[in-house]
């Protein structure tokens, strides 16, 4: 067996996750530089070009220092889901290992993490008729009605979804209608397919009030860095609200609130407050997911460069023992 083949078979993959604004990206980058690894981004929005500030993408300097995957690989209007990511990421990890490099997965998109750790079945393609009927139900009865139905049919999966993410809600019910099986059940059937890669998951944790402070501060920093201009450029490309509603990426927190500002629905101050509120809500759902679905080793989220260095060294020590 070649050294590359031995590496592919033997090297586990460090997975760093945690709620938004917990410092995952900085820790993963520091670790990757230290062990000469490549980073697989498990962020469902960083894959899209043109959404840089609002998704907290790695800087150009960081991208030059470490090889990153699933950053700026898709156009915003392209459809890309967790099932696609799971298959692509597993293939990409194997390719990284074949080169003799280590891979680090970093991100907090719960469906992406779920797919890697627990698997996804080969989900059916979209059915235009079923989707149209569900969309009509959504338009007439609202998201609450569809979410209530999903909660009845697949409560475990429903708990992982944000009811306001209507495209995911419609897709979940579409899958159940087509297959006659729950999304939870389909994922369970897929779990064994992932046995070729062993993940060592770590999660970053911090007190809830401190996390919320970080979220508020980061939102202000994004606005100061040009998020309003970035959102305006997207708004001008996808002018109508109806057009934006058909593109899942444009439902991203940080953009949709500013689109509403451009539509005259909110003041700018209120839009920023909503970004902070919705991001806090998202972090809360992430924490619920991590608690209920993941078996991870928790680390204190670093608050400064000294703590970041200490966490990096701790991960290197733990990884060297695998």
UniProtKB/Swiss-Prot annotation:
Its cofactor is Mg(2+). One of its GO terms (molecular function) is tRNA dimethylallyltransferase activity. The keyword ATP-binding applies. It catalyses: adenosine(37) in tRNA + dimethylallyl diphosphate = N(6)-dimethylallyladenosine(37) in tRNA + diphosphate. Keywords: ATP-binding, Magnesium, Nucleotide-binding, Transferase, tRNA processing. Residues 43-46, 167-171 are annotated as: Interaction with substrate tRNA. The record marks 109, 131 as: Interaction with substrate tRNA. InterPro entries: Dimethylallyltransferase, IPT, P-loop_NTPase. Substrate binds at residues 20-25. Monomer. Belongs to the IPP transferase family. This is tRNA dimethylallyltransferase. The lineage of its organism: Bacteria, Pseudomonadati, Chlorobiota, Chlorobiia, Chlorobiales. The gene is miaA.
